[in-house]
Amino acid sequence: MGQGLGIKSCDFQAARNNAEHHTNDISSQRLFVRRGQPFTISLHFQAPVHTFLRALKKVALIAQTGKQPSKANGTQATFSVSSLGDRKWWSAMVEERDDQSWTISVTTPADAIIGHYSLLLQISGRKQCLGQFTLLFNPWNREDAVFLGNEAQRKEYLLNQNGLIFLGTADCIQAEPWDFGQLEEDVIDLGLSLLTVDNQVEKWGNPVHVARVLGALLHILKEKSVLPTAKIQTTEERALLNKRRGSAPILRQWVTGHGRPVYEGQAWVLAAVACTVLRGLGIPARVVTTFTSAQGTGGDLLVNEYYNEEGLQNGEDNRGRAWIFQTSTECWMARPDLLEVYDGWQILYPSALKGGEVLEACDLVPVRAVKEGIVWLTPAASDIFASINASCVVWKCGEDGTLELTDSNTKYFGNNISTKNVDCDCHEDITQNYKYPEGSSQEKMVLEKVQKYRMKHKNDGIYPPCCETDDPLHLFLKAPSSLALGKNVEISVNLLNPTDQEKEVQLAIGLQAMYYNGVLAAKLWRKNFVLILSANSAKKISTSLFNSNFEQSLPENSFLRLTAMATHSSLPCFAQQDIAIRRPHLAIEMPETAEQHQTLIALVSIHNPLDVPLEDCVISIFGKGLIHREKSYRVNSVQPRNTLRTQLKFVPMKVGCQRLTVEMDCNMFQNLTNFRTVMVVAPKSPA
């Protein structure tokens, strides 16, 4: 090579470079760097370089990616090694040199194509491969389209693998620990392998394109991999499928077929896995939960619900459904394809693939556009706007199939829109990013804007039908927002007759189990009353919900929906409340700090609130930096109203803030989880 000049070895200095590029948690052996930021390599020549001065004038590096690298589409770049560097293009400059070695600083463009690269040395036209590296997006670089200026946010939305996903109801938000695992080496490889389905490699430097492709492909993989409930036969299968530990095993299953299948009730899995892949490739991302969300409306701002005379759900609206909660993925980037005002958080909105165009199966909607009601900006903007701004209309279904509009308390969509707080393990309410305050002048202006657009282009409005009546009756339902299993609870219904006429009222109170997506799981209990309300009077009806009414019939991962239907001479009245189930609490006691390589003890306890024993109990513990592999322990049965306590020992391996997750499975419950964080410090040096 080069008239005798050859390379003895090349050191990519992976450990040092990865630390400087915030990728050291991915690997210390392979080179992972972020675009727009220099990295250093060392070349060691086979002979003193001063004897090959003519050849040295023609030294260049070649960086290439993809199956067929080409200068024409930007997948191959050739750049000379000099004492000067161009920070806006591929460049290399010699930082240090001696007789037989060079230390070279290589800089990539801030808009370079991401992916796996080969780096070659070219001397006098002859080429030699130096090795491979992986190039990622760079939120630390101001010139990168994914630049995020806040360091705490970069750590949370890019580097933090210990996530929380928020489930439950708007009045009882429940945190679910989630291991994103975006810094696992094979997770990044799997994310990049997904991209290879897309032939437009030249667009892999554009985070908008990359996010849309990944969103569409992950949605397709999810639909192929999710198992329907009917296929789940045994307790063991159900236990396996209900695991919600993290994204990595699910992604491996989706992409390679070697991993964990997914139970169809876990719709938040897609949002979590998408968040993992985006973070792994360098795009800041987070999982967002919307409580009470209108889904499947096609942009319509009305959702119809149907209940029978006993207040129990009766049929569904083909045009939409009210979900108790819905999860999505937000990612952070500039939008050069739109106006600058739409830079920032974008909502990944995948849908069913129609035809062969992958990009059409996933939209990327600016959060700002949703807040301002710009529903025509992108194809999915109207759907997302409707999901948090729709109105719900409740219809009473007669035995003969007739429908009657009810006077129902307004169900507000888009409540307590939540994501993990940057500074702590709790939820942050980001509703103000999506909506102006309820009843504000700004909200009114936005709704009027959308109303005008829909009347012009869709020939329909956004406001529900009027339910005013000359013979009113008011109905108020009072119940707790959550219910602990094993406990009875008092509920009450208040009826108010504001008229000068006596009323005969038929009151039906019903209890149902609902899945998070608004699908009826089971009808559990009902009670009927016939009441006489005097003119201008109020009456309170109290009753008890006994755990025996629902405890044995409650499906896994469901909620309680309490309803009240009051029928009288005029418009029926309806009220409802969703109640979250509080399963047995898995308590963890452990020190807040621990020493690396020293045994740490965690005390785990659980109380059985039921009248039957908890049997076949298995406790599992896992946590990056704390436990090398997941450990499982079979423990004693927990008798009714008794408490189980057990000690678990492990040795922390990594310094820093680490999370221990504890999970318990038994015959009555799957996936009872809790977590604690511990600060692991380096061992004290001997005096």
Curated annotation (Swiss-Prot):
Subcellular location: Cell membrane; Cytoplasm, Cytoskeleton
GO biological process, any: erythrocyte maturation
Superkingdom, natural source: Eukaryota
Membrane topology: Peripheral membrane protein
Keyword annotations: Cell membrane, Cell shape, Cytoplasm, Cytoskeleton, Erythrocyte maturation, Lipoprotein, Membrane, Myristate, Phosphoprotein
Pfam families: Transglut_C, Transglut_core, Transglut_N
SMART domains, alphabetized: TGc
InterPro entries: Ig-like_fold, Ig_E-set, Papain-like_cys_pep_sf, Transglutaminase, Transglutaminase-like, Transglutaminase-like_sf, Transglutaminase_animal, Transglutaminase_AS
Modified residues annotated as Phosphoserine in this record: S247
Region (Band 3 binding): 31-39
Primary location: membrane
Transmembrane segments: none
Alphabetized SUPFAM superfamilies for the sequence: Cysteine proteinases (SSF54001), E set domains (SSF81296), Transglutaminase, two C-terminal domains (SSF49309)
GO terms of molecular function: protein-glutamine gamma-glutamyltransferase activity
Gene Ontology cellular component terms for the protein in this record: ankyrin-1 complex; cytoplasm; cytoskeleton; plasma membrane
Lipidation sites (N-myristoyl glycine): G2
Other facts noted in the record for this chain: The substitution of an Ala for a Cys in the active site may be responsible for the lack of transglutaminase activity of band 4.2.
Family (UniProt): Belongs to the transglutaminase superfamily. Transglutaminase family.
Function description: Component of the ankyrin-1 complex, a multiprotein complex involved in the stability and shape of the erythrocyte membrane.
Subunit structure: Component of the ankyrin-1 complex in the erythrocyte, composed of ANK1, RHCE, RHAG, SLC4A1, EPB42, GYPA, GYPB and AQP1. Interacts with SLC4A1 (via the cytoplasmic domain); this interaction is mediated by the SLC4A1 Band 3-I dimer. Interacts with ANK1 (via ANK 1-13 repeats). Interacts with AQP1 (via the C-terminal).
Name this polypeptide is given: Protein 4.2
Organism: Bos taurus
